[in-house]
């Protein structure tokens, strides 16, 4: 039995071989490799002669090159990526000599194809790559600078060259058997440690035993000069990928599951804190604006409420930071990087800053007042229209008014809550199918699904909530300009009326905004109303359309009607033609009756042409059914072809049966005595065939 990558030195005087054994991890432990119907025997060292030195060197060189590209263990890099066609199970690799192996399999060539089917690591690793994409192939490229020098190769390609092994042995570099992904802390990120897995340890022990066998075989043919490289084995430092084991895959899935659960919990707490702060803000704004029980902005009740709003805002900002940190760790788990700065992109930083600012706006204690310009239109003045002029005046308005309006921007957390609690995101099968089809389960996907499944409920709920929020914001902006002219009930009623009319893109001019903020709210409401109106029209148009089955029924009935009218028009043309012929042949009726039949004949021709035109237009308008008809014809043709094949096979079997019966009858007829009452001559074969 001969191992690859061994060095043979032939001495011409003694005709002996000098073998230099180099350590390796044997993936094939059998001396005979079976591939297909061809059995290849590896040449033994004892059978080599002096004339076969060149052939032996070529053989060992080819085996060294093939084993150099052979994978040692299951690696993320050697797994098939999502972009490949067959990504369910790893494909077998064939080297130049016909040996079969798999990058995920530790078995020999004879058992490689069957062992991988029952290997749970193969299935789990393939599914993991299908969900996380091809970024895992470049895992070592995402490592930190300080760790790149200590990381062994990921693709686990073995370098059996003399220069590589001698250099490593001379320098005394410690042995590395490949890093294995382990998870020390499931609450944080993954850490890569250079530990010896049980599989690699088993391979190392088998390689040592195999090396002893090779040394014994080499000693039988000559002296042995062996390098002490079994304990200082180094793989080619390609820094590409990281080998993984089944425990690492389970830990990765566990970390990912925990991070997804933490994201949902953080979002829930963030929404609760945001709603709590908004409720406190609403209570404080209403009691201070209406001066209930003499409570003003400087009262201790108002200050206490704003302190509660500030505390809830601080807690909300803390949860926003936790949410983005959790997303960064989740991205680290997905891509395999060990430095958090790799996944922190510009888009993520901008998103975090926008969310932090939106959630950080709130009414603060002792915020003070500011000057706000109110524009009093001429409609609110008495007297002749010529004397009415637009006047502006500055009014002291609390800063909490504008802060309270911007505080409602944190309502975007409800959209995130809706996405994370949707059945599309909660269902693992739906999320897996979406990942395999490169579809992200985000806010856009959930909104489109809701509009497709329950459009009326979604639009009604959104319109009602939007109407209430915009009405309250309009009241906050306009309530300080009336200075007690109208009671608060009339103010809220006018606000609801104004927002509803503006939302429906109507304007009667009875209520107009007095502040620039109110005008901005009116413009925003008009734009949103236009968008919602267009969506509502599209939904109604889709609902009033006929289904495909209903259209098929109507098309069939209309087609039958056109066919009947076509036959009737053709019959009328023939009928009036016969009448004209009878009038021309006979003398009864005169020219008056002839002209009557001729006019009817022309009318029948025009009717026939119009029916033909309608049939042509109907066939053109229903051209979309042609693919269905083509598919139906193809299916019918396939079924008929299958039936014909069955008939041909049955006919052949009947012919074989007939021939067998004929042969049996021909051989058994001379030995059968003639029955009484029958002819004494044997039945001819052609008569038997006809009778049969």
Swiss-Prot record:
Cystine connections: none
Pfam family, any one: SK_channel
Ranges of compositional bias, category Polar residues: 667-683
SMART domains assigned to the protein according to its UniProt record, in alphabetical order: CaMBD
Highest taxon of the lineage: Eukaryota
Disordered, as annotated region: 667-692
UniProt keyword Transmembrane helix present: yes
Intramembrane features from the record: 492-512
GO cellular component labels: neuron projection; neuronal cell body; plasma membrane
Keywords assigned by UniProt, alphabetized: Ion channel, Ion transport, Membrane, Transmembrane, Transmembrane helix, Transport
Subcellular location: Membrane
GO biological process: potassium ion transmembrane transport
Description of how the protein assembles with itself and partners: Heterooligomer.
PANTHER family documented for this protein: SMALL CONDUCTANCE CALCIUM-ACTIVATED POTASSIUM CHANNEL
Similarity field: Belongs to the potassium channel KCNN family. SK subfamily.
Primary role: Forms a voltage-independent potassium channel activated by intracellular calcium.
Name of the featured protein: Small conductance calcium-activated potassium channel-like protein 3
Organism, scientific name: Caenorhabditis elegans
Lineage: Eukaryota, Metazoa, Ecdysozoa, Nematoda, Chromadorea
Annotated gene: kcnl-3
